[in-house]
């Protein structure tokens, strides 16, 4: 049975966690130098259109379709600049060591042996470190690196325009659920 697995590189909704911090005049938090990871975020609307377009594709077997939004890959340092600009706030950042996730995991792991709640927190910290340090782009196996140029782009919605819409109130901030760092 033919199937298509769609793997979005990042979602706008996963990049809204620091809007309130920036609006309050607090620094945008970066891990390391803010260039450890990058992504090509895609809007829900553009992703929905991409998925619908896949329905017309005829193929045999299962295919995996990575997809990102339009434009160049965006690192957290560039996200900070976009968000501060959209909020009409000066660019202020604070760098945190990504190793902090390991430090907290080491502290909580003994408690995780006895508590499912702490076990969930330890797992969350493992996942958070991954997202803080690994790019959400296509992997170039030959060169052993993430490759923004080989990550397909789709749509027309940009993260900068999304930030402006949320900050102006013309678009509601998306629900992020329980798995959020900020």
Report residues per predicted region:
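Short, polar/charged, Gly/Pro-enriched helix-capping and turn/loop motifs at alpha-helix termini
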Residues: 61, 93-94, 173-177
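Oxidoreductase cofactor-interface core, primarily capturing Rossmann-like NAD(P)-dependent enzymes
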Residues: 1-89
């Amino acid at each position: 049975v033919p199937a298509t697995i769609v793997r979005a590189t990042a979602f706008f909704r996963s990049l809204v966690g620091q809007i309130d911090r920036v609006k309050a005049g607090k620094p945008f938090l970066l891990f390391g130098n803010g260039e450890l990871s990058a992504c090509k975020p895609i809007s829900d609307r553009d992703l929905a259109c991409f998925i619908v377009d896949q329905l017309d594709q005829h193929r045999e077997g299962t295919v995996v379709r990575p997809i990102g939004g339009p434009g160049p890959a965006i690192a957290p340092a560039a996200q900070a600049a976009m968000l501060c600009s959209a909020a009409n706030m000066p660019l202020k950042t604070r760098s945190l060591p990504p190793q902090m996730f390991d430090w907290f995991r080491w502290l909580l792991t003994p408690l995780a042996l006895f508590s499912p709640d702490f076990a969930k927190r330890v797992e969350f910290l493992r996942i958070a470190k991954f997202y803080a340090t690994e790019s959400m782009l296509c992997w170039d196996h030959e060169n052993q690196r993430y490759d923004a140029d080989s990550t397909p782009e789709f749509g027309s919605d940009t993260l900068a325009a999304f930030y402006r819409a949320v900050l102006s109130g013309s678009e509601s901030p998306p629900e992020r659920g329980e798995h959020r760092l900020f």
